[in-house]
Amino acid sequence: MAKFQAKSQNDAPDDGLKEKMIAINRVTKVVKGGRILGFAALTVVGDGDGRVGMGKGKSKEVPAAVQKAMEEARRNMTKVSLKNGTLHHNVFGHHGAANVMMAPAPKGTGIIAGGPMRAVFEVMGITDIVAKSHGSSNPYNMVRATMDALKNSTTASDIAAKRGKSVEEIFG
């Protein structure tokens, strides 16, 4: 029931961003008088054009935790350059024991990725990609590893500018 309440009470600002909830965990804090129950939420937010952010939120109630996570995700957005709905080149990322590999894919391939990575790609507007995760399947670490890999991606024009050459000289 709490998941449905989170959806109906979510007063998201109409800013055109796509939101996805990846995980909700029930957490407990043990105190002298017993246990205090709470909830932790992991969400991703994107504009469908290369901007994406992740957020975590904790609260005593599920809707409040999700709302906090969405707000944090909006504050922590990064821009990733896309090429025809996919990446420019293969990228690797890691966080903790989670390692991810992403490769660009031709048009019509779709999103071939598992779990939390798929949610990140959907909100940021990637339509064709092949991704694989190794090691930890913890959603928090997988999302952070995915974000790390996306931050490592560059364009040919970026590399050409760093080298002081033209894009044709880089490829030629």
Curated annotation (Swiss-Prot):
NCBIfam families xrefs: rpsE_bact
Keyword rRNA-binding: yes
PROSITE patterns assigned: RIBOSOMAL_S5 (PS00585), S5_DSRBD (PS50881)
Keywords noted in UniProt: Ribonucleoprotein, Ribosomal protein, RNA-binding, rRNA-binding
GO CC, alphabetical: small ribosomal subunit
Upper lineage: Bacteria, Pseudomonadati, Pseudomonadota, Betaproteobacteria, Burkholderiales
Species of origin: Polaromonas naphthalenivorans (strain CJ2)
Protein name per the record: Small ribosomal subunit protein uS5
Source domain of life: Bacteria
GO molecular function annotations of the record: rRNA binding; structural constituent of ribosome
PANTHER family, sorted: MITOCHONDRIAL RIBOSOMAL PROTEIN S5
